[in-house]
Amino acid sequence: MYTLKRFGQHWLNDGAVLDRIVAAAGLACGDRVLEIGPGLGSLTARLLRQVPVVAVEIDRRAVAQLQRQFGGDKRFVLVEGDILREALPEPANVVVANIPYNISGPILAKLTGSLAQPIRRFRTIVLLVQKELGQRIAAPPGSRTYGALSVRLQYLAECELLFEVPSHCFTPPPKVDSAVIRLTPRPFALQADDPAHLDALVTRAFATRRKMLKNCLKGWVETEKLLAAFASLDISPDARAEDLSVERFVQLSNRLAESDYPSGAARGDRRA
């Protein structure tokens, strides 16, 4: 079956890589997997060897092939539709998928939620994504790729880049390399008192990279108040956004939000 560009289709055909993806999920008795965009069913077949699978597929050609291939297996449920419009299947507690790169962001948001409304229903989420995106998601503080996306997702889940997948493992080969990431949603050891404030802080902090944080937040919070918060948290007054860990961002947000919102602050303001 030929691929359709509008669906961002690239068939993963390397058996060793497929096996590593399944292994990364650590599947156990009682698990039920949500697979997004199963395509030709190469990953589906391996998942079904261990656990039941609920698959969501938008391409009618793939739906017909999957029904022929797995329709007789009672542990396989196929939903024809758009994952961004469909409700997440209730029984599934694990996600394993090779997702379309052109809608990776919306899919991640669908699976993990937002800072204000996190989704914790999945035990683990294993996704094949564009390598650059995987690096940004799992980036540590101080690294070149650490940014607003890193902070938001690492607040919601433990984020790991497990291994890279070269383009020749796909048909047709994408123009970029890929990577497998694992997200483990977690109860928060450090909870933001006001997630909307944290979201706005992160957005403004990373609006201009390499700029000192106190300058990024100028006009949003009084400099005197900001420097006092820095001092109380042992944050350098010359710190940049990329220097702060997720925990530090939460602590700073909590400290700044102890009083009224600073003049001009927008709840949930997102520009990054």
Swiss-Prot record:
<dbReference type="GO" id="GO:0031167">
    <property type="term" value="P:rRNA methylation"/>
</dbReference>
<dbReference type="GO" id="GO:0005829">
    <property type="term" value="C:cytosol"/>
</dbReference>
<dbReference type="GO" id="GO:0000179">
    <property type="term" value="F:rRNA (adenine-N6,N6-)-dimethyltransferase activity"/>
</dbReference>
<feature type="binding site">
    <location>
        <position position="37"/>
    </location>
    <ligand>
        <name>S-adenosyl-L-methionine</name>
    </ligand>
</feature>
<dbReference type="GO" id="GO:0052908">
    <property type="term" value="F:16S rRNA (adenine(1518)-N(6)/adenine(1519)-N(6))-dimethyltransferase activity"/>
</dbReference>
<dbReference type="InterPro" id="IPR020598">
    <property type="entry name" value="rRNA_Ade_methylase_Trfase_N"/>
</dbReference>
<feature type="binding site">
    <location>
        <position position="82"/>
    </location>
    <ligand>
        <name>S-adenosyl-L-methionine</name>
    </ligand>
</feature>
<keyword id="KW-0489">Methyltransferase</keyword>
<comment type="similarity">
    <text>Belongs to the class I-like SAM-binding methyltransferase superfamily. rRNA adenine N(6)-methyltransferase family. RsmA subfamily.</text>
</comment>
<protein>
    <recommendedName>
        <fullName>Ribosomal RNA small subunit methyltransferase A</fullName>
        <ecNumber>2.1.1.182</ecNumber>
    </recommendedName>
</protein>
<keyword id="KW-0808">Transferase</keyword>
<keyword id="KW-0694">RNA-binding</keyword>
<keyword id="KW-0949">S-adenosyl-L-methionine</keyword>
<comment type="function">
    <text>Specifically dimethylates two adjacent adenosines (A1518 and A1519) in the loop of a conserved hairpin near the 3'-end of 16S rRNA in the 30S particle. May play a critical role in biogenesis of 30S subunits.</text>
</comment>
<dbReference type="InterPro" id="IPR029063">
    <property type="entry name" value="SAM-dependent_MTases_sf"/>
</dbReference>
<feature type="binding site">
    <location>
        <position position="57"/>
    </location>
    <ligand>
        <name>S-adenosyl-L-methionine</name>
    </ligand>
</feature>
<feature type="binding site">
    <location>
        <position position="98"/>
    </location>
    <ligand>
        <name>S-adenosyl-L-methionine</name>
    </ligand>
</feature>
<dbReference type="InterPro" id="IPR020596">
    <property type="entry name" value="rRNA_Ade_Mease_Trfase_CS"/>
</dbReference>
<dbReference type="InterPro" id="IPR001737">
    <property type="entry name" value="KsgA/Erm"/>
</dbReference>
<keyword id="KW-0963">Cytoplasm</keyword>
<dbReference type="GO" id="GO:0003723">
    <property type="term" value="F:RNA binding"/>
</dbReference>
<dbReference type="InterPro" id="IPR023165">
    <property type="entry name" value="rRNA_Ade_diMease-like_C"/>
</dbReference>
<feature type="binding site">
    <location>
        <position position="12"/>
    </location>
    <ligand>
        <name>S-adenosyl-L-methionine</name>
    </ligand>
</feature>
<dbReference type="InterPro" id="IPR011530">
    <property type="entry name" value="rRNA_adenine_dimethylase"/>
</dbReference>
<dbReference type="Pfam" id="PF00398">
    <property type="entry name" value="RrnaAD"/>
</dbReference>
<feature type="binding site">
    <location>
        <position position="10"/>
    </location>
    <ligand>
        <name>S-adenosyl-L-methionine</name>
    </ligand>
</feature>
<keyword id="KW-0698">rRNA processing</keyword>
